[in-house]
Amino acid sequence: MSYAHPEVLVDTEWLSQNPPNENRKLVEVDYDPVNGYQKGHINGASLIWWKRDINDPVTRDIISKKEFEALMSKNGITADTEVILYGDFNNWFAAFVFWVFKIYGHENLKIMNGGRKKWELENRNYTTDEPEISPSQYVGQPPDEGLRAYLFDVSRGIGKEDRKYCSFWSCYINSRPIKL
C-alpha cells in the first residue's frame, strides 16, 4: 500500500527502537482513556483526552491558541519537539489532533501507523506508569484558517458537478471506516 504522505507516518517497529526522549514526545490521543491510556500505554507516552483537552465545551470548537499552548507546555512539548501521535479508534482522534497541531503551526509531527490496535496485535508492551514530564514553554503560531472548512465553505462546494469532490482549492474527504 502506498500513502500520499508517508513522511508523516512511523511504524510500530521504528517506534519500539526509537523511544520518546527530550526532543521526541509520544502522545496517546484517546476518545476513551479509561479503556485506553489508563489500562496501559506505550512507555513514555503522555495523554491528550480528545473530549476534555482539545474541544472547547462552550463553543464546541477546537481550543484556543492560548489553551493549545498551555496543553503543549503541560506535555513538555516545544515548537521544535518531534511529536508522534497514536490512539484508540483506529487513530481517528489522533488524526484530528494532528490537524489541530497543524492549525497552530506545529511542523515536526507524525502519526504511528495502525495506532493502539496495531501495537496490541503485535503483542507489544504497555505500561501504566505515568511519564515524568518537565513542563515547557510552548509558543504556537496564529491559527492557519486555510486549513479549516466552515459550514459555508462546505455548502458552497456541495452539488457543483464540475468540482466533484475536489477542486484546485479544496477536497472533501470521507474518513468513515469501511464496513467489514
Enumerate the predicted regions with their spans:
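Positively charged, proline/Ser/Thr-rich regional signature most characteristic
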Residues: S2-A79, S155-L180
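Thiolate-centered catalytic microenvironments shared by cysteine-dependent enzyme domains
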Residues: D56, I62-K160, P177-L180
